[in-house]
Amino acid sequence: MRLTLGKGATVVYRARAGACATRRHGVRNLRIKAAPLGELTVVNGVNLPISSTPSSASSADAKFHVVGTPYSMLSVSLSASQNLYTRRGTLVGLSGKADNVISTLSVLEPLRRAVFGIPFLYQKISSPSPIKALVSVQSPVTSFAVVHLDGTVDWMIVQRRALLAWTGHSLNIKPRINRHLSVTNWGSSEVTGRGLLALVGRGQVYSIELKAGEQYIAHPSNVVAYTLASMPPQPYRFKSTTLRFQIPGLDIPELLLKSRYIRDFTASDTWKASMRIFHNVRTWARRTIWGDRLFLRFEGPATLLVQSRGARVRDIMSDREVNEIADTPAGTTFNAINKLTGVTKEDKSDYQRAAEEAVSQAPVPSRTVEGLTQELKGVSQAIAIIRDGRVEFETFKSQNDDARK
């Protein structure tokens, strides 16, 4: 019995050893671990550190502290007679003398903010005694980032719903349109003054520090906020590699283009409506499928706050902006070239217009205007005349020779 069990144990041990050996040769041993909080990370071998945002920020009258990570809450400590503005419906709890707390609903520039798609309903909380409040958001995949403004550097908040709470008597927040940048102008807010800001982002929020002379390319849907510098961010597109296959051309498309039926059909309202629908579908595809090809280029010195979960391109770009970045409809470049060169139909000669009408009205248009002109010149150069029973060829001079003389 012992021998049998020993043989069985030996067989099982050898089978397990063989399986382990097979796994060692077939699979690579990879270890994935999260970076410690606050540790600097080198990006692609370039000395451009990416670090987590500070968990707390304090001023003389208030203090913001982020509790928990990544799905966190914001702890706000307010001194006496200090105002706290938080988005409506985000206040979780409050500690202190509740009888002294005054809460009012503030409507901040509803006309301008509604046009830009920025929330304008905020809750104003103040108390003559010190209090502590907890603020959170309804979305389960957001995290907080706190920013301390000392009056020397201004900030631009890119995402529409990124601003959650702020405090500071001299803090000024206004919606802005950056005319130099048409990609992320809608929903941006410029923050000036002194105070504390609480921003929220999808996923984790990280901070990127750029020194003078450094550049960074970021997707607009991942940028939460950035510091205002002398050089605003510019739209940027990576060079794409396309494979173009050359197929031997046929004369069928050229014959179809010469057909009068095809020309009349392309000039009809049905064709134009179908082309507009196709252009709208192409715009939607570029916004949803190829929208990741649109980037922003930042120049240092600057500080960027990026989120790990990007927003949709629809949230930061309008249809008009996508159409401007995408290719223009067919025919626009041709019309622009005609205006530039001044070649219009009115400038053409009577002979040119008559020749084009003759070629287009022919049942089988197998000749071009140039070919018809050459043919007419060849026929008009010589003529046969019968004189005294003999055939004589008399040559006539062309109009160009007469003009030269």
Curated annotation (Swiss-Prot):
The keyword Mitochondrion applies. The keyword Transit peptide applies. Residues 1-88 form a transit peptide. One of its GO terms (biological process) is inner mitochondrial membrane organization. Keywords: Mitochondrion, Transit peptide. InterPro entries: AIM24, AIM24_sf, Trp_RNA-bd_attenuator-like_dom. GO terms for cellular component: mitochondrial inner membrane. SUPFAM superfamilies: TRAP-like. It is found in: Mitochondrion. Belongs to the AIM24 family. This is Altered inheritance of mitochondria protein 24, mitochondrial. The gene is aim24.
